[in-house]
Amino acid sequence: MTTVGVSLFRRSPEKITMKIATFLGLSFLLIASYVLICEAQHPGFQELLILEENMRDPENSKERSCAKPRENCNRMNILCCRGECVCPTFGDCFCYGD
């Protein structure tokens, strides 16, 4: 009985490292899948918030449904109130300029 108990604790460091790496990799994949599923279920959520905010903003009373500087643009036909829509290589497009 003691040999069985002792052998359980005599695992090689390589096996332990592989198990930890596998656990971390699977955890990352699980979190990434949750993020992708959430984005797929709520597409354009941020753009809708911009439109709703602009509808209540007296500064944009003439130019409704437009994005202010540093807000996302060019998705779902959202144009910039002032300035131009800049799209970096990675990430979302945003309004630049005053």
Curated annotation (Swiss-Prot):
Subcellular locations according to the entry: Secreted
Keyword entries, A-Z: Disulfide bond, Ion channel impairing toxin, Knottin, Secreted, Signal, Toxin
Tissue: Expressed by the venom gland.
Main localization category: secreted
Disulfide bridge positions per record: C66-C81, C73-C85, C80-C95
Signal peptide: 1-40
Molecular function GO labels: ion channel regulator activity; toxin activity
UniProt key word 4Fe-4S: no
Cellular component aspect of the GO annotation: extracellular region
Domain notes from UniProt: The presence of a 'disulfide through disulfide knot' structurally defines this protein as a knottin.
Function: Putative ion channel inhibitor.
Name this polypeptide is given: Hainantoxin-XVII
Source organism of this protein record: Cyriopagopus hainanus (Chinese bird spider)
